[in-house]
């Protein structure tokens, strides 16, 4: 309902997703104040220029305890996002890119992670996420993530680069990161539309100093400047917490036997999969 008199002047009230909302036009059609009541969601839109073909403006808001801010350009075919900032106690990032609206929804973003609390990963519910297969198959996305450790940070990872491609439910990830000058690379792919998605992976570790790397994990090792090269291929079922190793190679002198692969499988599942799939992201368990 729209009110244009009294203390509710220039106010629109209604209901969406079972929650009441209120929009205040601020006596100016270029400024909109939106609140979804009893949810902690509030958005303020400021349009600096708009016509039938293009809208330019910025957005500020709060989603629960998180603050967001961004400039944008909308022209019916796409939304160009500039200087997007997300700030929250456990997660902060900056992002820029384009969201294509026609003929299909496609998201292309470059995102720099400023801060991430690993505890957030423990709260990920993959099973609930995979229940939205009808939505997942309609999303096409190309997203680049980057992270660089700040000075005096306690983060184990020095830097991280990740490319994520999602198209028609098929997810491909290229990931590389460094820990104490040792380089990790991992490529993976999976079909999220399958009843039990299986992730195929091919991962490599290249280290020129095994001692320096292990020290990051509080593991003592005697010899300096000893190289460590590991290649691991396999697949894992992200809902059943099961993994199968196709091959494991260490340096030039070790190739895992069938019995070794079975041992690594059981050890991996008992330690890293003790609760759920996301435990593989907790480096302290390695």
Over which residues does each language-model region extend?
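Membrane-proximal interfacial segments on either side of biological membranes
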Residues: 1-180, 184-286
């Amino acid at each position: 309902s729209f009110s244009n008199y009294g203390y509710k002047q220039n106010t629109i009230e209604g209901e969406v997703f079972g929650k009441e909302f209120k929009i205040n036009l601020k006596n100016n059609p270029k400024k909109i104040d939106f609140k979804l009541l009893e949810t902690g969601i509030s958005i303020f839109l400021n349009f600096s220029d708009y016509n039938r073909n293009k809208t330019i403006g910025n957005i500020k808001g709060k989603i629960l305890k998180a603050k967001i801010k961004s400039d944008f350009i909308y022209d019916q075919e796409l939304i160009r996002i500039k200087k997007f900032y997300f700030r929250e106690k456990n997660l902060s990032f900056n992002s820029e890119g384009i969201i294509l609206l026609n003929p299909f929804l496609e998201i292309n973003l470059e995102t720099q992670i400023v801060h991430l609390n690993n505890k957030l990963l423990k709260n990920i519910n993959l099973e609930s996420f995979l229940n939205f297969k009808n939505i997942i198959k309609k999303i096409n996305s190309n997203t680049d993530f980057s992270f660089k450790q700040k000075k005096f940070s306690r983060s184990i990872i020095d830097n991280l680069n990740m490319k994520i491609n999602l198209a028609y439910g098929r997810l491909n990830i290229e990931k590389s990161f460094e820990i104490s000058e040792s380089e990790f690379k991992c490529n993976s792919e999976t079909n999220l539309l399958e009843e039990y998605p299986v992730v195929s992976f091919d991962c490599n570790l290249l280290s020129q100093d095994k001692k320096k790397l292990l020290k990051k994990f509080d593991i003592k090792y005697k010899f300096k400047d000893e190289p460590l090269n590991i290649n691991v291929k396999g697949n894992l079922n992200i809902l059943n917490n099961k993994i199968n190793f196709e091959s494991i190679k260490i340096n030039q002198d070790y190739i895992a036997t069938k019995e070794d692969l079975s041992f690594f499988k059981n050890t991996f599942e008992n330690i890293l999969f003790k609760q759920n799939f996301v435990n593989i992201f907790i480096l302290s368990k390695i």
